[in-house]
Every structure is written in C-alpha cells, then in structure tokens.
C-alpha cells in the first residue's frame, strides 16, 4: 500500500465481492476493533443465491486476545497524530467463518458495528481470504 492510502475497511454493513472457488472450507478475516471489542453477524452469500450468517468478533487493538480471539500479529507501539510513538502493544486478530465447501462464495456482508456498540467503537478489516 502506498503511504497515506486506505489500507482497511470499517465494518459498516457493506457487501464485499469475493472471488471464490468451490471447495473452500473457511473464510478468514484479519481485523481489530478500536475503543472496545466488537462483533456482529456476517453474512456469506454463495453463487447459487443461498446464504449463511455467522458471528464475527474482534478485540480492541490495544488489548491482548480475549473471548477466543487469535493474536495474528502485534506491534510494540502506535503512531500518534503528533508524530510521536505511543509505547503500547497493539494487536491485529484473526477470526474465521466455516463455509459450505460444496458451494462457491460470491460475497460477504459485514456487520453493522456502529448500530450495535457506542458510536466510538469501530472494527477495521485488513484482509479477507478463503481457505
């Protein structure tokens, strides 16, 4: 990613197209929440028009894993708007949704986090992938 360009999406109920292949068993996500842990329903739609809903959950990026989170990576500090480093460990978490492997994924609809938690809480998704 070039500097100062968007490198994540906010989970805000949007539909994201996924170019899947038949046989995938899981849909994986890398993400984290800010100002508290957050989660909600994520809907996977298959190319045959059927769908399934599962729960997606990410912990607060300034706290270690909890509630079944998996620490995908950690950083020893975060940058502040003033250009200084804040010496606090920051985290990105992994979560996954089990898929019907007899079908092909067409899209995923993200949770509407702002409707479920205080308006200060947000969930950032950095990557989505099939396995």
Feature locations, PLM:
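N-terminal/edge-of-domain interface segments
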Residues: 1-131
């Amino acid at each position: 990613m070039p500097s100062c360009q968007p490198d994540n999406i906010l989970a805000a109920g949007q539909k994201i197209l996924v170019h899947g292949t038949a046989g995938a068993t899981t849909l994986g996500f890398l993400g984290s929440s800010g100002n508290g842990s957050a989660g909600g329903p994520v809907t996977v739609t298959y190319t045959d028009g059927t769908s399934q809903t599962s729960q997606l959950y990410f912990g607060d990026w300034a706290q270690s894993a909890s509630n079944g989170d998996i620490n995908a990576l950690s950083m020893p500090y975060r940058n502040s708007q003033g250009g200084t480093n804040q010496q606090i460990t920051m985290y990105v978490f992994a979560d996954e949704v089990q898929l019907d492997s007899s079908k092909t994924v067409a899209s995923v609809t993200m949770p509407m986090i702002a409707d479920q938690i205080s308006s200060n809480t947000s969930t950032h998704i950095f990557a989505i992938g099939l396995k």
